[in-house]
Swiss-Prot record:
Keyword Repeat: yes
GO MF terms, alphabetically ordered: GTPase activity; GTPase binding; spectrin binding
Highest taxon of the lineage: Eukaryota
Keywords from the UniProt entry: Repeat, Transducer, WD repeat
Function: Guanine nucleotide-binding proteins (G proteins) are involved as a modulator or transducer in various transmembrane signaling systems. The beta and gamma chains are required for the GTPase activity, for replacement of GDP by GTP, and for G protein-effector interaction.
InterPro entries, A to Z: G-protein_beta_WD-40_rep, Gprotein_B, Guanine_nucleotide-bd_bsu, WD40/YVTN_repeat-like_dom_sf, WD40_repeat_CS, WD40_repeat_dom_sf, WD40_rpt
Organism: Mus musculus (Mouse)
Record-given protein name: Guanine nucleotide-binding protein G(I)/G(S)/G(T) subunit beta-3
GO biological process terms on file: cell volume homeostasis; G protein-coupled receptor signaling pathway; regulation of cholesterol metabolic process; regulation of fat cell differentiation; regulation of gene expression; regulation of glucose metabolic process; regulation of hormone metabolic process; regulation of phospholipid metabolic process
Pfam families, sorted: WD40_Gbeta
Summary of subunit composition and partner proteins: G proteins are composed of 3 units, alpha, beta and gamma. Interacts with RASD2.
WD repeats: 53-83, 95-125, 141-170, 182-212, 224-254, 268-298, 310-340
Length: 340
């Protein structure tokens, strides 16, 4: 047996010891805890709005904090800001690169950002004096594609990249303040905690990591998926996270218990997950799939309680409004749908 093999076995044994130690700390399972709870009734949601205007696949969307406006990014090379009440386009921003993979709305509503295969994060000012939307910053230092970006405020944004790193940027100077290193595969997704002090990332190494924005350190690593993690989100209270993977499952991890609580999957679901988001209470989990559907899960009972079907192609992105009143899905069929 080679030295490499010996070390590999040793590492596996240590991993098992850690898993056993974590299990020993758990005083109760989620299933036991909610055994007396009724399952949420059938969740039937209707399409209230269809946003038409993109001419190609939609890759990303993000709600503004006002729960009215949203930004979407498409392969047609446009970033569109929509008024979801009227379905009007507030801004249609032509991009320098049409290979866009992510977009984000600043909490203030003043800026939007996007990026993709150009390896850059472009910041657009929606409130410029001239009234026209133009690039205010291009943040370039990543050596791989930009997979996700999220604002902390008007001067700070966090990005994840195919170069396996995440980064915190000072938008004013255009410089990286902190680089978050630790993943061993392409970083696919990130989400910021409700208090903006932490963020989580999911990667192609099948792990999720919790990072401290100020300290620049990795606090926790969560494993369990058998394939790439494509999507990640915080539970509304910030004390748990959910991941969506190509292994056809979503998983719920508790930050305080430092371990997986449950998985959301069914034998009939064999395709990957592209996007995840919780309802305002956290009781419902919305997950977008490659099979054109969005499944609604009871997050506590781990049962599927609804399906949002209305797209003719992969559901690539979704999001729940800050006020919890609506969920938006975006698809490769070039449409966005607003449900409630």
């Amino acid at each position: 047996m080679g030295e490499m093999e010996q070390l590999r076995q040793e590492a596996e044994q240590l991993k098992k010891q850690i898993a056993d130690a974590r299990k020993a700390c758990a005083d109760i399972t989620l299933a036991e805890l909610v055994s007396g709870l009724e399952v949420v009734g059938r969740v039937q949601m209707r399409t209230r709005r269809t946003l038409r205007g993109h001419l190609a696949k939609i890759y990303a969307m993000h709600w503004a904090t006002d729960s009215k406006l949203l930004v979407s990014a498409s392969q047609d090379g446009k970033l569109i800001v929509w008024d979801t009440y009227t379905t009007n386009k507030v801004h249609a921003i032509p991009l320098r690169s049409s290979w866009v993979m992510t977009c984000a709305y600043a909490p203030s509503g003043n800026f939007v950002a996007c990026g993709g295969l150009d390896n850059m994060c472009s910041i657009y000012n929606l409130k410029s004096r001239e009234g026209n939307v133009k690039v205010s910053r291009e943040l370039s230092a990543h050596t791989g594609y930009l997979s996700c970006c999220r604002f902390l405020d008007d001067n700070n944004i966090v990005t994840s990249s195919g170069d396996t790193t995440c980064a915190l940027w000072d938008i004013e100077t255009g410089q990286q303040k902190t680089v978050f290193v630790g993943h061993t595969g392409d970083c696919m997704s990130l989400a910021v905690s409700p208090d903006y002090k932490l963020f989580i990332s999911g990667a192609c190494d099948a792990s999720a990591k919790l990072w401290d924005v100020r300290e620049g350190t990795c606090r926790q690593t969560f494993t369990g998926h058998e394939s790439d993690i494509n999507a990640i989100c915080f539970f509304p209270n910030g004390e748990a996270i959910c991941t969506g993977s190509d292994d056809a499952s979503c998983r719920l991890f508790d930050l305080r218990a430092d371990q997986e609580l449950t998985a959301y999957s069914q034998e009939s679901i064999i395709c990957g997950i592209t996007s995840v988001a919780f309802s305002l209470s956290g009781r419902l989990l919305f997950a977008g799939y490659d099979d054109f559907n969005c499944n609604v899960w009871d997050s506590l009972k781990c049962e599927r309680v609804g399906i949002l079907s209305g797209h003719d192609n992969r559901v690539s992105c979704l999001g729940v409004t800050a006020d919890g009143m609506a969920v938006a899905t975006g698809s490769w069929d070039s449409f966005l749908k607003i449900w409630n």
